[in-house]
Amino acid sequence: MDRNAAERRIAELRAEIRRHDHLYYVLDRPELTDAEYDALYRELLKLEEEHPELVTPDSPSRRVGGAPLEKFKQVTHRIPMLSLENAFTDGDIAEFDARVKRALALPAGEEIAYVCEPKLDGLAVELVYEYGTLTVGSTRGDGVVGENVTQNLKTVKSIPLRLEGENPPELLEVRGEVFLPLAAFQRLNAQREEEGEPPFANPRNAAAGSLRQLDSRITARRPLTMFCYAPGEIRGADFGSQGEFLSALRQRGLPVTSLARQVTGVAGVLAYYREMTEKRDTLPYEIDGVVVKVDSFPLQRELGEKSRSPRWAVAVKFPPRQAVTVIEDIVPSVGRTGVITPTANLRPVEVSGVTVSRATLHNWEEMERKDIRIGDTVVIERAGDVIPAVVKVLTEKRSGSERFLPIPAACPECGSEVVKIPDEVAVRCMGLSCPAQIRESIIHFASRNAMDMEGLGEKYIEQLLRLGLVGNVADLYTLTRDDFMKFDRMGEKLAENLLNAIEASKKRELSRFIFALGIRHVGEHTAKLLATAFGSIDNLARATEAELLSIREIGPQVAQSITTFFHNEGNRETIRRMVEAGVEPTVEEKKVGGKFTGKTFVFTGTLIRFSRSEAQKMVESEGGHAAGSVSKKTDYVVAGDEAGSKLDKARQLGVTVLAEDEFLQMLEGEQ
């Protein structure tokens, strides 16, 4: 390919990859399979390698991270990034509203239009776009001077390296919050504990630690994301309000929360605050309050700023999700990789409406650092679905009877040697036949998100182990009706159901089978990538590290873990036995020419005949796409009982709304 043809093709590939990055990471509406995306990305890398003079700073290939820096350079913000004044009560909100009205000399009875947004618990940053290209990214710092973290921010997939649309502004400074979703935070901490590294205390610390890496390649491996919420300096564009500004950011491809809303007066703010309080635990990321801003930019300018905070905005904080209780005992437990984790048994206490009786202590180094002892009075914190953690010891409450739990000399489950690996914080059982590791690996294999052996839970698996009927996961496929009838209080019907569940698991999707194997560092998402890329367990078992590294989102650590797993003779024998028993994982392919091909569905509310995930699979099996949010490109919204904001948005956008029965008629070909 000559240079001119290469230049044209590179431009096409970059535009296409940017479009699909935006669809995947911002809109949650992927149109390509991972394999199709990877093919585009590899073609771009190959062409840029052949024509290095055509590489540009805004190319998607620049997201991978570069050589480590010695230190971050400083960046002075053109307009200071101010902090917000806090409010905690209904009275505080009313007082803020009254101050705004007094400052604007509004007549009695006139209400202010506010924009309310969730207050994200992450790291504040500023993005600078010059003529549409991201040139500088920096942290807030002290509000006047921050750190230049441009290379790291370029690895965040939801941040466009180039703005969408024609005629971008000469200068657009955008402020926002970089954060780590809760599910990603849990995966990251689980991975760190397996690797013997100290876990992050909370998602905010994880986001800050990830973004402030001197080696941007480490940042690139962390699934950070961002929501934009405020302007800095702007030249070449003009906005009249916060609502108009957020709308313009969306049109330019920048990530903006879908929960921002214009409200009127104190009543509107309070209603929004209560709504977010209720939604807080259902969100996939951590929020710690609500930000309230005067919507009108002219009114914001009239109100002005104090030395450290604007007069036109306030942060309404949620009550803390903490409680004080007593550690009644500390119990070591063994995971499926042999890591021994201390867990605190607590005097039951209610935190944010949930009764908490256990808290993770992570590892012995963390216990020593916090000086946590049995009998201590402690402060615990619960965040979303994250396991509660001890955040502080109230040493002033000690009586002298408290005692520290030392690292066990032997595995509490099998008595094998316990080793603390150098440069790791993890303590591991070295027993190859440790019953706790075997138990946890079988529980994981049979679990709902893995092989989904319905009914075969922890209680029955422990009985199988106690009776010596299973020694690893392959033994599950050798069980008979007579084996189950040896259980306490086991009926023939239940035994038959368990055998049917095991039999049904033989045809599970390949991605589930890969996840079920318990390969270190391979979660559900990575398992799906591997299933798409290799198509069979045999192909994956033969894959080289180089082949694995060619897959988007697979790094050296994961690749090495996968090859190590399949090079192990015992693991290969286990898989061979399962295949001989009839385990035949399937690869789901979208139906070509299905009745929903090219159509996007969104499900909201409670469905009667099936779960939402089952309905989404039905759509995908007919060639359609099941999205998580409503947009102008949504074709149908299927509304069940108690449908919420998605139904309202569908009506606003004129999207066709279907009842559950109407969706079934379409599925069965009656419409």
Curated annotation (Swiss-Prot):
What does the record give as EC number?
Answer: 6.5.1.2
Write down the chemical reaction(s) this protein catalyses: NAD(+) + (deoxyribonucleotide)n-3'-hydroxyl + 5'-phospho-(deoxyribonucleotide)m = (deoxyribonucleotide)n+m + AMP + beta-nicotinamide D-nucleotide
Q: Which residues form a coiled coil?
A: none
Keywords assigned: DNA damage, DNA repair, DNA replication, Ligase, Magnesium, Manganese, Metal-binding, NAD, Zinc
Q: List, alphabetically, the Gene3D superfamilies matched.
A: 5' to 3' exonuclease, C-terminal subdomain, 6.20.10.30, BRCT domain, DNA ligase/mRNA capping enzyme, Helix hairpin bin, Nucleic acid-binding proteins
Q: Recall the GO molecular function terms of this protein's record.
A: DNA binding; DNA ligase (NAD+) activity; metal ion binding
Q: Which family does it belong to?
A: Belongs to the NAD-dependent DNA ligase family. LigA subfamily.
Biological role stated in the UniProt entry: DNA ligase that catalyzes the formation of phosphodiester linkages between 5'-phosphoryl and 3'-hydroxyl groups in double-stranded DNA using NAD as a coenzyme and as the energy source for the reaction. It is essential for DNA replication and repair of damaged DNA.
**Name under which the protein is recorded:** DNA ligase
- The organism named in the record is Geobacter metallireducens (strain ATCC 53774 / DSM 7210 / GS-15)
